[in-house]
Amino acid sequence: MYISNQIDPEWPRSTGCGPVGAISRATLICNLCALARSRPAMQTLPNSLPTQVTFKGTLEGLRLLIPVALPWEEVVLQLQHRLNAGERLWQGGAVVILEVGERLLDGPQLQAVTEMLTAQQLHLMRVRTVRRQTAVAAAVAGLSVEQQEAPPEENPDKPPALRGLAEPLYLQTTLRSGMSLVHPGTVIVVGDVNPGAEIVADGDILVWGTLRGVAHAGAHGNTRALIFALRLRPIQLRIADRVARASDEPPAAPQPEVAYIQDNTIHIAITTEFARRW
C-alpha cells in the first residue's frame, strides 16, 4: 500500500476542521477521520468452505483433511508444503486417515497422495469418503475404506422407509490382508476376501469368490441381513450382534452358501436349500 505524506489543502475547508494553512496534528487527525468516513464500510464476508489442507493428530492416527472445493493442483501444493514444514505433528511410521467427504478422488490421485505420504515415512491406512466412486477407487488401490453416509435428503415426498438408504457398493477386486471396508449399505465383492481382511456393512454382504476373512452384515442391528459367498470359509461371521464362524468341515463339493439368523442364531446353508426354505 502507498500512503502519501501530502495533505489535500481542500480537506480542512470541506470538513470544517480549520482554515487552509499550516497543518497541525489536530488538523491531520481530522483529515484522516474525514477520509475514513468517506470510505465505504467493510462488509463481513460470508462463511465459506474450507480451503486449507490440514493435519489433525488423534488417538487413531493422523487425520488428513482435504477440502471439497479446492482445485487438485492446489491440494498437491498445500500437501507438499505441510509435509515439508519444519514443525510436524508426527513421527516416522505414523498412520494416516485420509478424510475427503464429498470430494471425488480417482486412482491416480489416491496414488499421488500415498506416494507423498510414503516419502515422509507416513502410512495411508484408511480413506473416509461419502462418494461411492472414491470408495471403489480406494479399495481397488488396496486401501482400507470407510464410506460414510451422505447428508439426509430433504424430500418430504419420499416414504420414510426409503429415506437415507445407501446404494450398494460394488467392487471388482480382491481384499487383501489388512484391508477393511465399511459401508452403510450392501456390499458386493467380485473377488476373494483374504484372511486378515474385513467387511462391515449395514446391509447384506455378497462375495462372488471365496470369503476367508471377517464379514459383519447388518452392523447396525439388522437381523435380516445375509452373508453370501461362493465359498464360505471365514475367520468370523457376524450378523447384527450375533457371532459365528464357518464349520471346520468344508462341504464335500464347494457350493455357494449363505449365512442368516434364525431363532437368534446364525445358521449356514447351501444357497439352493436356503432359497427353497425362504
Swiss-Prot record:
InterPro entries: CAP/MinC_C (IPR016098), MinC (IPR013033), MinC_C_sf (IPR036145), MinC_N_1 (IPR055219), Septum_form_inhib_MinC_C (IPR005526). Pfam families: MinC_C, MinC_N_1. It comes from the Bacteria. The keyword Cell division applies. The keyword Cell cycle applies. GO terms for biological process: cell morphogenesis; division septum assembly; regulation of cell septum assembly. Keywords: Cell cycle, Cell division, Septation. Interacts with MinD and FtsZ. Cell division inhibitor that blocks the formation of polar Z ring septums. Rapidly oscillates between the poles of the cell to destabilize FtsZ filaments that have formed before they mature into polar Z rings. Prevents FtsZ polymerization. HAMAP family: MinC. Belongs to the MinC family. This is Probable septum site-determining protein MinC. It comes from Gloeobacter violaceus (strain ATCC 29082 / PCC 7421).
